Amino acid sequence: YWRLGQHVGKVVGDRETLYVLNHPARYKLTVPEAIDRVHEIRRFGWTLDAVEVSDTGLYRPLYDTDEIPLARIATDDAHRPPHFGRAWIEVEAPRDRDAIIRAIRAGDFRTVFASRD
């Protein structure tokens, strides 16, 4: 979202699209600032379905709150090898892009973080 310099992830299915508020931790947003971003992006006419509660695969509990009115997902958002495989979501849905997107929107998934042994 260019007006705020905010990354919004776009996950494309066959008919469904999931939009994710990416990197609130990397932008060092407070929860009120993250909520303001959600409202600003929606005022512009964009849809948001989820917020990233991880940063390079590490859990950021600050954003795992009902105050942010979005599904809370985790990704490793890997840009470098040490970040690969740290975080993901597991969805109970048919192996179909649109079914997976609908399940995420409905909150029918669990967030998983790799153990830090």
Feature annotation, model-predicted:
Residues Y1-A34:
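Divalent metal-binding pocket/active-site signature
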